């Protein structure tokens, strides 16, 4: 045996300490926290180099994870389906039948048809991310810039619970949260102040829809139960869609036209 390998020799003779594996596991668990602490305290060129190294490590790790996932998922065989008599359990195993393609196309067309409305404002100006979301700098040295504050009017439901402020990425100020909208019925030519039920679609971005941001052209759902509208079957209509026609952040109120 080579010199200076006395620890390995001792382990071969007498085995490991009883708490060795537990201590090793705990040390490995602490390592992530220690690296994080080290990264926070570092400044200057040393910090830049360290972050670059960590960035490269993370990319490599993500690539490895992706490779493992690819290996585990079953790949679809695009080869032609064998001609002739095929047992029932092998039918539709490989390749796509023409009927399946047609069925999917019809389903897709139905979805598209269902998603279209005749709206008062068919085209509106897109709202950029810099316009809607203001960057909030945080951290000891105000270096972190992952938080965003919504600068437009938004709707937040009654069941919404805030995350702890430290972990909240999108901040929606109380002053910009609206609960009611002035909705005009195009046939009755009358305006009603109705409670908002939710934001159906913001034309600028799906992110704004999930955040409940209300800008010009947004389709919102309003409670029309007090209007007394009924269906052909005699049931009271509870909610209906309306499109916002003004800029609520400038006017201080939401004006919308009911989609009938």
Swiss-Prot record:
It is found in: Nucleus, Nucleolus. InterPro entries: NSA2_fam, Ribosomal_Se8/biogenesis_NSA2. There is a cross-link at residue 80 (Glycyl lysine isopeptide (Lys-Gly) (interchain with G-Cter in SUMO2)). GO terms for cellular component: nucleolus; preribosome, large subunit precursor. Keywords: Isopeptide bond, Nucleus, Phosphoprotein, Ribonucleoprotein, Ribosome biogenesis, rRNA processing, Ubl conjugation. Residues 20-34 have a biased composition (Basic and acidic residues). It comes from Homo sapiens. One of its GO terms (biological process) is maturation of LSU-rRNA. One of its GO terms (molecular function) is RNA binding. Pfam families: Ribosomal_S8e. Belongs to the eukaryotic ribosomal protein eS8 family. Ribosome biogenesis protein NSA2 subfamily. The modification Phosphothreonine is found at residue 81. Component of the pre-66S ribosomal particle. This is Ribosome biogenesis protein NSA2 homolog. A motif (Nuclear localization signal) lies at residues 11-18. Residues 20-41 are annotated as: Disordered.
